[in-house]
Design a protein with these regions (language model features):
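N-terminal subdomain of nucleotide-sugar transferases
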Residues: 1-54
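Nucleotide-sugar-dependent glycosyltransferase catalytic domains
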Residues: 29, 40-181
Length: 181
């Protein structure tokens, strides 16, 4: 029987990558070969936890996140401006990231994707015959208390609960639209 390989793909801040290290260690303890594909800036973090590292891209995500451009984008109150801004930050790295995802998924039977790797990762999984699994450590269920993780929170004012629930439904529609293209 061929060796079961699971590729975890996670990009973003360390807080977005760290839960996948924990997941990888659990899968590894269950006897599964695990690869964690992420930005090269997390290579030592991944390997010091005993996981196989694969580079998605040579992107210093911490530097991008701390840039004045990123701070200005994150300060916006307009969800569409936020999405456009985030895409403008990642667009220059997209082809390199997609190539890295394809390499990391080679021979894998499952690709577990975080929200920031779902767009290219889903297609890479399908191309290579790996089952794509979406894994979210942020709340993705519509709720009154929190908005979608992909939009800025609204200040505490009347109507905030409606806004919070609506952001989740809008993101579900956008994700559905993306996968039907």
């Amino acid at each position: 029987m061929p060796e079961k390989i699971v590729t975890l793909m996670a990009t973003g801040s360390r807080g977005q990558v760290q839960p996948y290290v924990a997941l990888g260690k659990g899968l590894q303890a269950a006897g599964i070969r695990v690869r964690l594909a992420t930005a090269s800036s997390y290579a030592s973090f991944v390997t010091e936890h005993g996981l196989e590292f694969h580079k998605i891209a040579d992107v210093d995500t911490q530097s991008i996140a701390q840039s004045d451009e990123a701070k200005a984008i994150m300060a916006t109150k307009d969800p569409l401006t936020l999405l456009r801004g985030v895409f403008s930050l990642i667009r220059p790295h997209f082809q390199e990231s997609l190539d890295g995802m394809l390499t990391a998924l080679d021979g894998a039977s499952v690709g577990i994707l975080n929200p920031l790797t779902q767009y290219g990762g889903y297609d890479a999984c399908k191309k290579l015959g790996a089952k794509p699994v979406f894994s979210y450590v942020q709340s993705m269920i519509p709720m009154k208390k929190l908005p979608s993780a992909f939009v800025p929170p609204m200040p505490a004012i009347p109507g905030q609960a409606v806004y919070n629930r609506l952001t989740h439904h809008i993101m579900l529609l956008l994700r559905s639209y993306n996968h039907n293209m």
